[in-house]
Design a protein with these regions (language model features):
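A composition-driven surface/loop motif
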Residues: 2-205
């Protein structure tokens, strides 16, 4: 998949399949974009390491965590909140769960390693204000993020926690998408990927 170096609209309704390449196994390199609002970048040179990563497995009844070097997180039922830098690997299947990167948290790498995650009330993944996050799709894996019609602020049946997108990047968030696996995004609410500003595309193949 290739993105030209031009503004790229990711405010997508319906189904979206994202296949990106370019993550290699070493330390995370930084891509930045200066904007008051959230920015999503697809990149060819963002790198990550699984060494010392903290791993989570989602199920319909909860989230289990395997020991790793990074403990900046909290779990409440099927909701995972990350509040400190580190590498976090997520897998499993959950019909109503979520992942939130807490506002102002930088240098987070979130590795999708065979994750099927649906949220019935909000965005399955929320990158809070002024966060710095690399979302890496692990090679050889199929991953699916989905929401429901209740995740639409414009709907009369909207959830109180609605974000109107499956992947929400709030103001000031810098989010890099990369990886050679497959990410399927199914938006029943409104948008597939939404940030607070026009998204910038970088070539990814």
């Amino acid at each position: 998949m290739k993105y030209a170096n031009r503004p790229l609209s990711l405010l997508v309704a319906g189904a979206l399949v994202v296949t990106l390449a370019g993550c290699s196994s070493s330390a995370v390199s930084t891509l930045t974009a200066s904007s008051a609002a959230g920015t999503v970048l697809s990149a060819t040179e963002s790198e990550f390491s699984l060494e010392g990563a903290t791993a989570f497995t989602f199920t319909d009844s909860g989230i289990s965590a395997a020991e790793g070097d990074y403990n900046g997180y909290t779990i409440e039922g099927t909701a995972l909140t990350i509040s400190a830098a580190g590498t976090y690997v997520v897998s499993g299947s959950c019909a109503d769960g979520s992942i939130t990167i807490k506002a102002d948290t930088k240098n987070v790498t979130l590795v999708l390693n065979g994750l099927e995650l649906t949220s019935t009330t909000t965005a399955p993944i929320v990158c809070g204000k002024s966060t710095g996050v690399t979302i890496a799709v692990q090679s050889g894996t199929q991953n699916t993020l989905a929401d429901t019609a209740a995740n639409n602020k414009d709907s009369e049946n909207a959830s109180a926690d609605a974000e109107s997108s499956v992947l929400k990047c709030k103001d000031g968030a810098q989010v890099v998408l990369c990886g050679s696996g497959t990410l399927n995004i199914s938006a029943a609410g409104k948008n597939g990927i939404k940030s607070g500003t026009e998204n910038e595309g970088r070539e990814a193949s």
